[in-house]
Amino acid sequence: MNWQTELNNSLNWILTALFWVVLCFSVTMLALKQTTFGKKFWCIVSPSMDKKTSIKLILMLLVLFIMILLEVRFSVLNSFFYNGLYSSMQELNIEKFWFFAKLNALLVVAQVIHAIADYFFQQVFEIRWLESFNATLVKRWLNKKKYYRLKYERDLPDNIDQRIEQDAREFITSTVQIVRGVINSVLTTIEFTIILWSLSGVLTLFGFNIEKGVVFFIYAFIIFATLMSVWIGRPLIKLNFTKEKLNGDYRYSLIRVRDNAESIAFYNGEPKEQTFLQHQFRQIIHNRWSIVLKMLGLNSFNSGVTRVAKLLPLMLQAPRFFSGQIKLGDMHQTVQAFNRLMTALSFFRLFYEQFTLYQARLNRLYGFITKMDELDKQNVHHPFHCSHRVALKNFGIKDEQGHVLLNNLNINLENGDALLIQGASGTGKTSLLKAIAGIYPFETIGIAEHPCMGSLFLPQRPYMPQGTLREAICYPNINPSHAELEQTMKDCALGKYIHALNVKNDWQAILSPGELQRVAFIRILLTKPDVVFLDETTSALDETTENLLYQTIKERLPEMIILSVGHRSTLQQFHNKQLKLDVCLLCEN
C-alpha cells in the first residue's frame, strides 16, 4: 500500500463504500424492526415519516453518509502522508519532506471545508427531522383532546412537556450520533485493519511466533476492554432513566409553586413547600451520587485502557523498528492506525454512558407514544346529534369505573332559553355540563343534541395564553383587530386595561379571578355563539357585576342558548329553566 494508490482510488472507494453503507444500513434497519429495541424505535419515528418528509430526510441522510465517508477517507490519506513525512525526515530528504508537507497542508484545507459542511448538513438533518417529529408529537397530544383526557388516566406519563421538548430533541441528536459513530467505526475498523495488517510482521509472544500478531493482540485487547466496560456500566441505564424522571418532577413542583404563589402565600405554606422541595431534591442528589459511584468505576477503567493504549503499539512494533524492518514513518502510521482502530472498536465502550441516556429517552418517548395509541383506541361512547337546539334524551353520565352518576335526564332548550344547573357539591354539575358540551372524558348514556358549530365553553377560571392582552382576550379564534373589542371591554367593566392591549405579559397571573371572568363575557360578546356553557363563570364576581354581565349578554344575544352552573340564587332571574341535580327535576320558572 502507498499514498499514491490510495489518493487515486479515493473517488472509487467513496462510491463503493456508499453502496455498501446504504445496503447494510437498510438491512440493519429491517433486522432491528424484529427486535424489542427496533420496535420501540420504529413506533416512535414512523408517525412523523410521511412520504414527503421521508424523501427529504433520506436525501439528507445520503449526504451525511458521504460526509462520514469523506472523514474516514481523509484519515486514511492523512496516515499515509504522515508516513511519508516522517520517513523523509529519517532519510534526511528535504525535497521529499516539503512535498509531503504541502500535501498535508492541502489535506488540512480540505478537512476544514469538510468539517464546516459536515456540521451544516448534520444540523439541517436534525432540524428538519425535529420539525416533523415535534409537529407529530404535539398534534397527537392535542388531537381528540388527549391532553385533557390524560388528566384522568391512572398511569399518566410523567412530565409530558419534558418528553415532547427535551427528550424528543436529544433523542434525535443522539440517534444521529449513534448512526454516525457506528458507520464511522465500521469503516475505520476495516480500513485501518488493512493498514495495520500491511505494517505488521511476526510478533513473538511468550516464545511463540505469531504472524500478523500485532493485529490479533490489539483486537483481543479492545474486545476485552469493551466487554468489561459494558459490564461495569450496565446499571447506568436504570439510573439515568430515574434521573430524567426525578429532574422533571422537581421542575414541575417548582412551576406549581410559581403558578400557585398567591394561594401558598395566603396559607403561609412556605415551610411545607420547602420541606417537599427539599425531599424531592434529596432524591435527585441520592440518584446523582449513585451515578457518580458507577461512573467512577467506568471512567477509571476507561482511563486506564486509554493510557495503556498510547504505549502499546510502539512496544509491539519496537523490535521490528530497531531491527530495520520498518521505518520511522511506519512506526508513526502504526500508532495512528492503532489509535484510530482503538477509537473505532471502542466506540460502544466510550459511548456507553450516552447510550444509557439514549435508551432512557427512547423508553420515555415510547411510553408517551403508546399512551397516545391507547387513548386513540379507547372507544368512549358519546352519542351526539347536530341540531339547532340543545336537547337531552334519557341522558346520563358514567365515572371512570363505569358507574352511573346521572341518568334519565330529558331537557329541551330552544333559541333564547337559559338553563341553570344547581345542586350540592359533588352531584356532577360540571361533569354534566362537560358531557353536554362534548368534552366529558368518560362514557355517557342516551343522546345529546347541540349545534356542531357555534358553541363556547367557559370554565370557572378562563385560560389566558401567552402574548399581548389583545391576543389573550381574543383566544382562540377571535379577530385581534375586532372593531368592537374596546367598547366590549368597557361594557364588561374591564375598560381600565384598554391602554395595555398591546402589552406582552403573563396576564393569567396579573388579572384577578374576577377580571378573568369578565374576560370570559367579553369572549361571549365578540364570538356570538349559538350556545354558551358557563361553569360557575361568575363565582369570583360581586352580585352587581354579575347582574351587569348577564343582562348584557341577554340583551345583545337574545337568541343564544345559555347553560349555567352556579350556586347563587341571584342567577335564577337570568334563566327560564332550572335543573336541580339533587332531585333531578327540570323546573319552569
Curated annotation (Swiss-Prot):
GO molecular function, one term: ATP hydrolysis activity
GO cellular component: plasma membrane
Chief location: membrane
Compartments where found: Cell inner membrane
ABC transporter domain ranges (all copies): 390-587
PROSITE patterns: ABC_TM1F (PS50929), ABC_TRANSPORTER_1 (PS00211), ABC_TRANSPORTER_2 (PS50893)
Domain ABC transmembrane type-1: 57-357
SMART domains: AAA
Transmembrane residue ranges: 11-31, 57-77, 97-117, 190-210, 213-233
Keywords from the named record: ATP-binding, Cell inner membrane, Cell membrane, Membrane, Nucleotide-binding, Transmembrane, Transmembrane helix, Transport
Coiled-coil residues: none
Pfam families: ABC_membrane_2 (PF06472), ABC_tran (PF00005)
Membrane association type: Multi-pass membrane protein
Residues that bind ATP: 423-430
Family: Belongs to the ABC transporter superfamily.
Protein name, as recorded: Uncharacterized ABC transporter ATP-binding protein HI_1467
Organism: Haemophilus influenzae (strain ATCC 51907 / DSM 11121 / KW20 / Rd)
